[in-house]
Amino acid sequence: MQGALRIGTAAFNAGDHRAAHEAWEEPWLALESGTADERLLHGLIQYAAATHHARLRNWSGARRLAASAAAYLSALDDGYREMNVAAVRTHLRRLAADPEFAERRRPLSLQHDGAALTPADLSFEQLASVATLLAEEYEAFDATVVDDAIRYARGELGDDDSPPEVTATRSRGFVGMLFDFADTRDGRAVVYDRLSRHVERRRSRERDVDGLFE
């Protein structure tokens, strides 16, 4: 649950609202209806959807989803699961009353344990989940390229993927490119092009080695 919250929170704050929705959907479907955890994830999923509809200027959809999301979060403690539930409820109620408010203000950032997480704040494995979600969400990205980049990055990290180690090595190699891919929405296409070229070069070397034994 905590991992899904961190992954979805980081994706949402990076502006990838549909990817955040996907991060929460699978654990949400496994929960019993009406439990506190189910209501939290249901509310967050609908907050992401409301924000997406507001971005598309679908005011009626944004209004409906914001009202529903606020209702799901209404019975939860203000800081349930270390999330900024109270602030999100307030934002949702304002969005439900005036969905065009979204044009005048950026979506309220989600916070987990007091921090507005971005992909740069995640462990490598959590970051890899975000990158995978993005590759599945956007047609411009080849999921097999991202999958191989993650595999190569794990090889760079070895057995230690703790956050301090990832932070120290993040600017280099496949690890750095994956962090940039997940964390740089506006320049993501450029980062992906660089990532795909590096992946293809590594694949080519692998094919050359395999050919030695044929």
Regions found by a protein language model. Name each.
Residues 1-214:
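Acidic, polar-rich N-terminal leader regions of halophilic archaeal proteins
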